[in-house]
Amino acid sequence: MLAYPVSSKPIDYSKPTFIQPKLDGVRCVIQSECRGSSWVIKAYSRTGKEWKNINHILAELKPFFQKYPKVVLDGELYNHDLRDNFEKIISLVRKTKPTDEDRLEASKKTQFHCYDVIFEDKNVLYERRRGFLGDHLYYGYKTINIIDNQIVNSDEEAQLYHKINLEKGYEGSIVRTNDPYQCKRSHNLRKFKDFSDAEAKLTSWVEGKGKRIGTIGKFIAVDADGNEFGMPVMDKFEYLQKNFKKMQGWIGKTATFTYFERTKKGSYRHPLFKAIRDYE
């Protein structure tokens, strides 16, 4: 989810303000589309790529879209049990020609976590959109989840809920103001996050040392500003060993990585490879 940091602009807590967990999932918007005389339900990534291995989710939403064909659901493909295995979520949803086995596994492990809805009337405030989701999608679904929201009245209260979200294993928190939906990054969404995400192009790799010989120890990468840095790879040894050759082929691709903060000179503190950004 694209969002500015909480610190980017003061928040007016005298107006309705909400906080929710920030998921480390794959962005997904779901909508109903008219095809001739019938309607079909489709799911897309942030960049418009169609997700083709979540038929179980689309089937479960069919009655909802029959009743509300002109709304769009905004959320993420996620499973909190896989919160430490982002690559698994990606591998399940990115398949363009899923087999029956792929669909079966996805049906067991992939869920849609909805955090907003888009109406034809773009002036609808978040408090009403939140109420709509609670009324129509909160109960009776197996793979559809509505992101939990809490009303907060101060930065101290928001920080408290953020701490709780971290303790529950979420990657951070999102603060929402009571404003209309924006189809772009806006100050209506702010993020509390101890680590940040960024993207950089992989230019080379360095083999691991000691017990990590035969695996990628780190990638060398260059960000959009031309800063070159090392991007360590931390994953299970078995996975790294099995995919040693495959990962060497990632050179030239764009990767997502996490980092704690940036120095005054623009360097990254504690950067870690997260995933290849070719799934959206």
Regions from the language model: what does each represent?
Residues 143-146:
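N-terminal, charged amphipathic alpha-helical interaction modules
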Residues 100-104, 121-123, 148-153, 158-165, ...:
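Short helix-to-loop capping/linker segments positioned immediately adjacent to catalytic or ligand/cofactor-binding
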Residues 75-77, 114-119, 148-151, 177-179, ...:
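Short, structured patches in soluble enzyme cores that scaffold and shape functional sites
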Residues 18-20, 26-75, 182-280:
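Classical nucleotidyltransferase
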Residues 148-196:
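Amphipathic alpha-helical
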Residues 9-141, 279:
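Covalent nucleotidyltransferase
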